[in-house]
UniProtKB/Swiss-Prot annotation:
This is L-type lectin-like domain-containing protein C4F6.05c. The chain crosses the membrane at residues 354-374. Residues 227-251 are annotated as: Disordered. InterPro entries: ConA-like_dom_sf, Intracellular_Lectin-GPT, Lectin_leg. The lineage of its organism: Eukaryota, Fungi, Dikarya, Ascomycota, Taphrinomycotina. PANTHER family: RE50040P, VESICULAR MANNOSE-BINDING LECTIN. CDD domains: lectin_leg-like. It is found in: Membrane; Endoplasmic reticulum; Golgi apparatus. GO terms for cellular component: COPII-coated ER to Golgi transport vesicle; endoplasmic reticulum; endoplasmic reticulum membrane; endoplasmic reticulum-Golgi intermediate compartment; Golgi apparatus; Golgi membrane.
C-alpha cells in the first residue's frame, strides 16, 4: 500500500515536471555581439520547437504572459531586436508589447503587466489580416491602463505596418541620447522621436495578452545589443543572407579628397588676391593717368616751383614701386603654387584627372594675367 502511494506521488511529480518548462529562466539571445541577458517568465509561457510562447497553447481561456530581464541595463544607449509570429484566428486581435520600465512587471491587465508602470511601452496590435498597429506610450506612474489603451494617455508616436497572417515579424527598437528613440518593423521605419529621454538602470520586458485560446504570440529570439550596431540586417538573425554585389570586382580606388579640397581652397584664395590686385592696378592706372595729364599741364605753365614737381614725381614713383613689389610677390606666389599643383597632379588619382587639368588651365590663365600686370607696372614705372 505504501509502495503504491509512493508510486503515485512519483508519477504525479513526473507529470508536473513534464507539463511545465524545465527552467523559469531563459537565455534567448542568438547574436554574437548581444549583451547576455537572463529572462524570467510570468504567467502562461511555454517553450516548444525553438519558440517561446508568451501565452500557453494548452489553456482554453483568456491569458497573458511576459518575460522580464532579471537585471537592469546600465548602458546609456541600446538596441532591442526580436522576431515573433502572431496567430490570430478569431475576431479579437492579439496584443504584443515591448517594455522598458523602472520595475519588473507582474501579471496584470495591461498586456501582462501591472498598472501605473514607469517607463516606456511599445504596443503592437495584430489583426486577422496580419496588419500591425504600433503605438508608443510613456508613463510616470500617473496613468492606470486598466485596458489595452487609456484615452487619457495618448501615444507619443504610432504607425501601421502591412504584414500577412502568421508571418515572422522582425522588430528593432533603438535608443540613444543623441538620436532619440527609433523603431523599425520588418525593416521599415515606423517612427523616430528625438525628444524622448529614457533613464539608465531600467528593466526590459516583452508580454502578450489574448482573449481566445487559439490566439498566441511566439518569439524566436530576443537580443539586447550595444547602440553602435548600425546594420539592421545584422540585428535580425532570421533574415536571409543577401549575396553582396560585385564580390569579384577589384577594390575601388581611394581618393584623397581632403588634399584636393585643400588645393581648391588655396586656389580660390589666390584668385581673390589676384582679383584684388587687378582692381587696385586699374584704380592706380586711372589715378596716374589723371595725375600725369595734370602734371603736364602744370609743367607747361611753370606756375609752381620745381621742388613741388620733384615731390609729386617722387610720390608717384613710390606708389608705382609699391604696386610693382606687390605684383612681383603675387607672380612669385603663383609660380610656386603652379609647381605644387603640378606635383599634386602627378600623385592624383584617375577620377580627378579632368578636374586637375581644369585647375591647371585656370592657374595658367591666372599666372599669365599676373605677369601681364607686372610688366605693365614696370612699363609705367619706366615711363615716369
Amino acid at each position: 500500500m505504501k509502495f503504491c502511494s509512493l508510486f503515485h506521488v512519483l508519477s504525479f511529480c513526473c507529470t508536473l515536471a513534464y507539463a511545465v518548462p524545465k527552467s523559469q529562466f531563459l537565455q534567448l539571445h542568438s547574436l554574437s555581439n548581444a549583451i547576455p541577458v537572463e529572462w524570467k517568465w510570468y504567467g502562461s509561457v511555454d517553450e516548444d520547437s525553438g519558440y517561446v510562447y508568451l501565452t500557453s497553447k494548452d489553456s482554453n481561456e483568456a491569458r497573458s504572459g511576459s518575460l522580464w530581464s532579471t537585471s537592469v541595463l546600465r548602458q546609456v544607449g541600446w538596441q532591442l531586436s526580436t522576431s515573433f509570429v502572431a496567430h490570430v484566428s478569431e475576431n479579437e486581435n492579439t496584443f504584443f508589447a515591448i517594455w522598458y520600465t523602472s520595475a519588473v512587471g507582474s501579471e496584470g491587465p495591461v498586456f501582462g503587466a501591472s498598472d501605473k508602470w514607469d517607463g516606456l511601452l511599445i504596443s503592437q496590435e495584430i489583426d486577422q489580416t496580419g496588419k500591425i498597429f504600433v503605438r508608443g506610450y510613456l508613463n510616470d506612474k500617473s496613468f492606470e491602463l486598466a485596458q489595452f489603451t487609456d484615452p487619457d494617455l495618448p501615444p507619443f508616436a504610432k504607425c501601421t505596418i502591412e504584414s500577412s497572417p502568421e508571418a515572422l515579424n522582425n522588430i528593432i527598437l533603438k535608443y540613444g541620447d543623441q538620436s532619440g528613440l527609433e523603431l523599425f518593423v520588418n525593416d521599415k521605419p515606423c517612427f523616430q522621436v528625438k525628444d524622448v529621454i529614457l533613464p539608465q538602470g531600467y528593466y526590459f520586458g516583452v508580454s502578450s495578452q489574448s482573449t481566445s485560446a487559439k490566439d498566441l504570440v511566439a518569439l524566436s529570439n530576443l537580443n539586447i545589443l550595444p547602440p553602435d550596431t548600425s546594420n539592421n540586417e545584422n540585428l535580425n538573425p532570421t533574415s536571409n543572407t543577401k549575396q553582396s554585389v560585385g564580390d569579384n570586382t577589384s577594390p575601388q580606388t581611394v581618393i584623397d579628397t581632403e588634399g584636393l579640397n585643400a588645393i581648391k581652397a588655396d586656389l580660390a584664395k589666390l584668385f581673390n588676391l589676384v582679383e584684388s590686385q587687378r582692381q587696385k592696378m586699374d584704380s592706380l592706372h586711372f589715378a596716374l593717368t589723371n595725375a600725369l595729364e595734370r602734371l603736364n599741364d602744370i609743367s607747361s605753365t611753370s606756375q609752381f616751383p620745381s621742388e613741388r614737381f620733384n615731390a609729386l614725381e617722387k610720390l608717384l614713383h613710390d606708389s608705382l614701386s609699391a604696386q610693382s613689389s606687390t605684383a612681383d610677390g603675387t607672380s612669385k606666389h603663383l609660380a610656386e603654387f603652379e609647381k605644387e599643383i603640378k606635383k599634386a597632379m602627378g600623385n592624383a588619382y584617375s577620377p580627378y584627372n579632368l578636374t586637375n587639368f581644369m585647375v591647371f588651365l585656370l592657374l595658367g590663365a591666372i599666372v599669365s594675367y599676373g605677369i601681364m600686370l607686372v610688366r605693365r607696372d614696370r612699363r609705367r614705372h619706366k615711363y615716369l
